Amino acid sequence: RDAECARYAGLLQRYPVDIVCMGIGENGHIAFNDPDVADFNDPKLVKVVALDPVCRQQQVNEQCFERLDLVPSEALTLTVPALLRGRWLFCIVPFASKAEAVRCTLYGEISEHCPASVLRNEADACLYLTAESARLLPAE
């Protein structure tokens, strides 16, 4: 695992990413940076993380896996700093189940408790929402 993280990080160093397409998880995660493991100042580009129960259940809810016992308990993920190195950040967020995470992203404290909140610091980040995922946002 460490060797694969190092290999992947080397590729990211050698071939910098211009466009990052990501989503926001039900717990506010970006990539697999769940609230318990997200680090806005992580020195690594890629790391192995333990997936929290909310994230694992989301994989089943979104039909990525048939059952919870089939969802891995660990994953390789780009770290928050690695994601933010992209020149353009596009975040696509469907589903009503993510409405609270979207609200926290846009109106909550910028902190690792809602990793997606860091996107508010990025001038080139674009958030694409559905009516369902935006349902808890104030009307403008």
Q: For the regions a protein language model found, what residue spans apply to each?
A:
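Conserved phosphate- and dinucleotide-binding cores of soluble alpha/beta proteins
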Residues: 1-140
